[in-house]
Amino acid sequence: MLSSTDLVQAVTADLGKIRETAPLVLSLTNSVVQPLTANLLLAIGAVPAMLNDAEEAVDMLRSGTGALLVNLGTVTREQGAAMQTAVREANRLNIPWVLDPVAVGALSLRTRLAGQLKEQSPRIIRGNASEIMALAGYSSVTKGPESTSSSADALHAARELALHTGAAVLVTGRTDYSTDGRQVTATENGHAMMSRVTGVGCSMGALSAACAAVSPTPLQAAVSTAVLMGIAGEMAFEQSPSPGSFAVSLLDSLYALSPEDVVRRARFLSL
Amino acid sequence: MLSSTDLVQAVTADLGKIRETAPLVLSLTNSVVQPLTANLLLAIGAVPAMLNDAEEAVDMLRSGTGALLVNLGTVTREQGAAMQTAVREANRLNIPWVLDPVAVGALSLRTRLAGQLKEQSPRIIRGNASEIMALAGYSSVTKGPESTSSSADALHAARELALHTGAAVLVTGRTDYSTDGRQVTATENGHAMMSRVTGVGCSMGALSAACAAVSPTPLQAAVSTAVLMGIAGEMAFEQSPSPGSFAVSLLDSLYALSPEDVVRRARFLSL
Amino acid sequence: MLSSTDLVQAVTADLGKIRETAPLVLSLTNSVVQPLTANLLLAIGAVPAMLNDAEEAVDMLRSGTGALLVNLGTVTREQGAAMQTAVREANRLNIPWVLDPVAVGALSLRTRLAGQLKEQSPRIIRGNASEIMALAGYSSVTKGPESTSSSADALHAARELALHTGAAVLVTGRTDYSTDGRQVTATENGHAMMSRVTGVGCSMGALSAACAAVSPTPLQAAVSTAVLMGIAGEMAFEQSPSPGSFAVSLLDSLYALSPEDVVRRARFLSL
């Protein structure tokens, strides 16, 4: 288990490597959050790619893609098939991929699809408490894309899910939990305003893919995601405490985020 | 017929109920305006949900959805079929639904579809003058999504459409008209800059769905929509008189909008 | 060959005509950039229309459309077929159309499609260096949607492509090159921050369509596009040097852009 100081160093190292290597992140994601996701990846220093065609997804994976994001937010049968194709190719090429199981549980198509995808070796699974509980097989009440459970409620499910799938699981909420099933890192960066902007959660999935492209382990990538996005959210709220301008400042903050900001602001909890 | 004072109280009551109950609004809407629509619903205090699959739309309607928006802006045959399924289920569950017939008249697929949907008991129909006239069966010249008629021109058509469909009709323009076919409420909040940001009109459709989830009548929901969005537009323009920053301030204004703002700014016309 | 003074006058004339005539630009474009594209067209004074259905594209072209944009960024087989239909109708009606071959080269579906579309008389082809080289038949290394070649590298390919297709070719980069195969105009407006916001390049394709609707020649429309967007980018960076707020200021700057700004800032290179 890393100390807080080691964790902070690992987060700043991931940030530095994203900016230095500009990993290409192929995001098969929902149409609502495509603009924010692409802009957020650009702001942190990664290169976003988005497309719909399965054959082209394979082409892109073979052309220097650093990580793949699969987000089920507005999935259709056709997009689901493209995701399956992309995941197989990513695994064949040993490209890390992230599963973001938006609103699984109540919605049938994505729940079936997520149940299949979780068996195909995602490196990271990112969700709120309700989504992680549903994906782990526990029932949970959701209200649309919003979670009604706390992330602490989901920690047991997250550990089971991590052990079952081999993925690092990132449960986002007031406290963010990152676990590979054995170790758990709890972090408390972020601001409630992040839930008043559409796509911030989904963009954490994309950021975790960028981190997975450069980080030594999926667990570290999950922790870096929670800390970097959380700190950017805090900085954004200090600049802009209303949701429209907050979303703008969130991008500005990710662009400006320095290693010193990480050292000063990262908050790890003892468990 | 309510007095202006009663109307203002009813608008502030709707605003309070949206913030208190956070209704889930399922928006089957066009891809151009999805981000603004979702952010606007979050800013006012509602919870947005968006998806593409017909089966999932039914699942979502059965999971606590407060209102459904059907917006035809980028409709395809496949999305049209999902909309038909969703509307049937909403009616079965007595969930209010809103029809936003973007650019009907010149465009064949959506004109046929809107003609069918208007017969299926929408609670609110929201459109600009050209769209309402076309949907009511009058010819009207449109220029893409922009209206070339004034909302006053469309008032007769709006009353007929309301009587025929049983919906409250909201005609948006410099003056906004809300009618159930018998009563008409004319309001004059808003700013011309709202037409320089894509999706503001479509977001009024989404806001009217949020209002329909909490308001005592569809007519009141239409009036509340016109007043709340119009006032937010005025406040936004005072902060930010250029279109990029205006769009940001529009979200900030909806978030900040107080009952006092409504009392001070609501402008009802005598007809 | 026009002098710099003549070129500046021609650019300001195009800007004036867009604002005066508000051309309707039908954009068949990728889902990531739809909101920015629509907002950018509105900011400069054009009217955006977006839709997915092939039959409706034909309807719209017959209803006063000034120019058509075909952008391959998230193309599917179905959207590709709609694009083919729209291009045929645009040519039949003598409506200028723009091809934006996003990320052609590595990705198979769009590369095949772009190869067909370039033979169908686009008035303007807009791309970065890698895209123009790939479309002209030269191999080039791309990293997702980003170009790894400089626009100067692509100038030879651009001239060949222009002569072969009859289109004006606009190669965007640090220096922007506009050519009809015989004349070349090089312009140096813009700012590197434009590449940190998703959709700025794609929005140049849309702006070039708006210019093509009003400009005396496709070549002039390409030059006007490069200069107007570049100047707006410079003005935006002076206001907002971080990417989130830069994107907002870019729209504000296009809205505010005056003929005097063009005269003062336009930078033409001698070749």
Swiss-Prot record, chains A, B, C:
GO terms, biological process: thiamine biosynthetic process; thiamine diphosphate biosynthetic process
Keywords of this entry: ATP-binding, Kinase, Magnesium, Metal-binding, Nucleotide-binding, Thiamine biosynthesis, Transferase
Cofactor entry: Mg(2+)
InterPro entries registered for this protein in UniProt: Hyethyz_kinase (IPR000417), Ribokinase-like (IPR029056)
UniProt key word ATP-binding: yes
Molecular function terms, GO-annotated: ATP binding; hydroxyethylthiazole kinase activity; magnesium ion binding
EC number: 2.7.1.50
KW Protein transport (keyword) present: no
Pfam short name (any one): HK
Transmembrane segments: none
Listed name of the protein: Hydroxyethylthiazole kinase
